[in-house]
Design a protein with these regions (language model features):
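Amphipathic terminal alpha-helices
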Residues: 1-4, 330-355
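N-terminal Rossmann-like NAD(P)+-binding domain of SDR-like oxidoreductases, especially those catalyzing
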Residues: 1-203, 344, 354
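Hydrophobic "lid"/C-terminal helical patch
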Residues: 24, 254-258, 288, 334-341
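Residue-level signal for the nucleotide or nucleotide-sugar donor/cofactor binding architecture
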Residues: 69, 98, 106-109, 166, ...
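Conserved mid-core alpha-helix of short-chain dehydrogenase/reductase
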Residues: 73, 113-116, 244, 249-252, ...
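Glycine/proline-rich active-site loop of Rossmann-fold NAD(P)-dependent oxidoreductases
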Residues: 180, 193-196, 205-221, 228-230, ...
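C-terminal "lid/loop" region of Rossmann-like NAD(P)-dependent oxidoreductases
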Residues: 237, 267-270, 282-285, 293-310, ...
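Non-catalytic, hydrophobic alpha-helical segments
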Residues: 250, 254, 271, 281-284, ...
Length: 355
């Protein structure tokens, strides 16, 4: 038995009680891998996620309550990891504008603390970081035109394939800056310290265990509001387009990245549903209305700083490198999430779109 209580080195998921983290933990545990969850348990619903995991996997995973901002506590917890998935973050653009110092400390300082803990362990622990499409900024150079209920890129290549990783980084809002700088630190630690790191720049992930109180869980927000008869506020005209990816496909990508970590060391990949799962907010709301059989109450407000009229991930790089592809269509995925929320929902706050 190891000093930390594990018979073998665990896969550590920082932020493992959250939406993506708990689904990733479930996948790893189902394959018999030891898992350590590190989380500050600050979000509503995370206790339900941990209880679900413990019930399903016989009181696993191991859980340590800790904050990424506390380097002294964090370092010994991750020092014996087989690998680290870093999913913990302050996720709201709105919060970053009001509390930029907290956003900086969690997203950038917290990521730095994890990288340093991995580096100082002397064990070349892989670190796979959950980044965001917000590192590309508002994409002012991507010209779009409005067609019916959606924005469409004028460029035929982007229209067919989406935004690829050669798109210039353009950090916007404190959230975009903190996540973008963290993204670059993770990549640089592969160059400067030979640490096996990789970055997944995520589009909109949705699915079971996503509770509607999460600022960026806008797909779940919309569904919860429809199911509860709450109004939905759209910022802008609702023609903004995003590619949405079911969490089961996201988990497969994270696991694929770990399996090929030495091959992809120091690289970043866009991760999303791609062009086949691209929807405007209006399209999604129409689908939700038909799915739930409810008339939605939709309010409109002015668009927000840094909001992208169009972001669809070009996933050809991750598909070619990892042999990964999105399997769950967006309509099937929405039905799956709606069914799950019917049985597990928390009462939502007034729903807001923050993509």
């Amino acid at each position: 038995m190891r000093p930390d209580g594990f018979r073998e080195a665990p896969v550590t998921i920082v932020g493992g009680s959250g939406f993506i983290g708990s689904n990733l933990a479930d996948s790893l545990l189902s394959d018999g891998m030891p898992v350590l969850v590190i989380d500050n348990l600050s979000r509503p619903g995370v206790e339900q996620n941990l209880a679900w995991l413990a019930q399903k996997h016989g009181n696993q995973p191991a859980v340590e309550t800790a904050d990424v901002r506390n380097a002294d506590v964090l370092a010994p917890l991750v020092a014996h990891s087989r690998a680290i998935f870093h999913l913990a973050a302050q996720t709201a653009v709105t919060t970053s504008l009001v509390q930029p110092s907290e956003d900086f400390d969690i997203n950038l300082r917290g990521t730095f603390n994890i990288l340093e803990a991995a580096r100082r362990s002397g064990k070349r622990i892989p670190v796979i970081f959950a980044s965001t499409n917000k590192v590309y900024g508002g994409l002012p150079d991507v010209a779009v035109r409005e067609e019916d209920d959606r924005c469409v890129p004028c460029d035929a290549g982007i229209r067919a394939n989406g935004i690829d990783e050669t798109c210039g980084l353009d950090f916007c809002t404190p959230y975009g800056c903190s996540k973008g700088a963290a993204d670059q630190y993770v990549l640089d630690y592969a160059k400067s310290y030979d640490l096996p790191t990789a970055v997944l720049r995520m589009s909109c992930i949705y699915g079971p265990r996503q509770f509607g109180t999460e600022d960026q869980g806008w797909v779940a927000h919309f569904l919860l509001s429809a199911l509860s008869g709450q109004p939905i506020t759209i910022y802008g005209n609702g023609k903004q387009v995003r590619d949405i990816l079911h969490v089961s496909d996201a988990v497969a990508a994270y696991r694929g990245a770990l399996a090929r970590i030495e091959d992809i060391r120091g690289k970043a990949f866009n991760l999303g549903g791609g062009p086949n799962n691209a929807v405007s907010l209006r399209m999604l709301l129409k689908e939700i209305g038909e799915l739930t059989g409810r008339k939605l109450s939709i309010l409109y407000d002015r668009e927000r700083t840094g909001d992208q009229p169009f972001f669809v991930a070009d996933t050809r790089k991750i598909e070619a490198t990892l042999g990964w592809k999105a399997h769950v269509s967006w309509r099937d995925g929405i039905r799956d999430l709606a069914d799950w929320l019917q049985h597990h929902r928390l009462e939502p706050e007034a729903a807001r779109y923050v993509a």
